[in-house]
């Protein structure tokens, strides 16, 4: 894999202008009042980044079409060029478990509603840990099992994740897909996915491989050598989500 350099990235110069242009792109003329909507501006979430990672360069994994990251010092990455027909904000593209930057490159990593889509979170988080500086922070915003369409599914345990590392991937994915279809799609809890063929959901980033509450993710991160800085059951400006902030030790 060819390594990239942070110094080669074209960072945004003006964060407020970047934010305005993105809201304009997504909402059109409604921008003039949408700018101040709490669920769009996400002031509380932005403050957590300022409080826990107020300096240094960061990497956002799977940024999609919205971000809360400080654009003047964050590299926006994604695995996909577009999401549901909308162009990603990302300027660099790669798989979340294969990051083309050197060891200890970043002061923080931000991930919002990404890790639940990843089949092998242990491998992925270890890769994120590799590119984090010592004492670097990881910010995980994730869907809460009890407040999303995953509420009828069993939670993903650490042992489940260990099994995925060594088990037969094709068979395990088939079992997860069956659970997803039976407890989410067939119950009409995610109708925006109805047009996607079942087998496609495995490869296109649709399916939630993981179902968690904060305690599950805290255990996972501690098991991988992180210290927990902060966690919250319900994010004030994204109420379907919980937050865990951890530090590389």
Regions found by a protein language model. Give the residues of each.
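S-adenosyl-L-methionine-dependent methyltransferase catalytic module, highlighting the catalytic core
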Residues: 122-123, 127, 137-249
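A short SAM/SAH-binding and catalytic strip from SAM-dependent methyltransferases
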Residues: 107-119
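Class I SAM-dependent methyltransferase SAM/SAH-binding core
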Residues: 52-98
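Helix-to-beta-strand junctions that scaffold the AdoMet/dcAdoMet cofactor pocket
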Residues: 118-119, 132-134
């Amino acid at each position: 894999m060819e390594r990239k350099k942070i110094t080669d990235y074209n960072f945004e110069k003006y964060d407020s202008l970047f934010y305005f242009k993105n809201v304009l792109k997504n909402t059109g003329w409604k921008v003039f009042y949408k700018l101040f909507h709490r669920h769009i501006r996400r002031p509380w979430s932005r403050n957590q980044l300022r409080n826990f990672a107020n300096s240094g360069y960061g990497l956002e994994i799977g940024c999609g079409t919205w971000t809360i990251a400080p654009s003047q010092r964050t590299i926006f990455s994604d695995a996909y060029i577009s999401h549901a027909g909308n162009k990603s904000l990302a300027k660099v593209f790669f798989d979340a478990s294969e990051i083309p930057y050197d060891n200890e490159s970043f002061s923080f990593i931000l991930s919002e509603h990404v890790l639940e889509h990843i089949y092998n979170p242990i491998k992925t988080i270890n890769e994120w840990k590799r590119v984090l500086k010592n004492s670097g922070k990881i910010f995980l915003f994730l869907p809460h099992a009890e407040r999303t369409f995953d509420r009828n599914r069993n939670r993903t345990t650490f042992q489940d994740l260990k099994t995925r590392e060594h088990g037969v991937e094709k068979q395990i994915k088939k079992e997860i897909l069956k659970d997803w279809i039976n407890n989410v799609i067939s119950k009409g809890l995610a109708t925006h996915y109805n047009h996607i063929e079942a087998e496609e959901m495995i490869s296109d980033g649709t399916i939630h491989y993981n179902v968690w509450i904060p305690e599950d993710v805290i255990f996972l991160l501690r098991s991988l050598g992180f210290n927990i800085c902060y966690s919250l059951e319900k994010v004030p400006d994204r109420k379907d989500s919980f937050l865990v902030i951890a530090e590389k030790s």
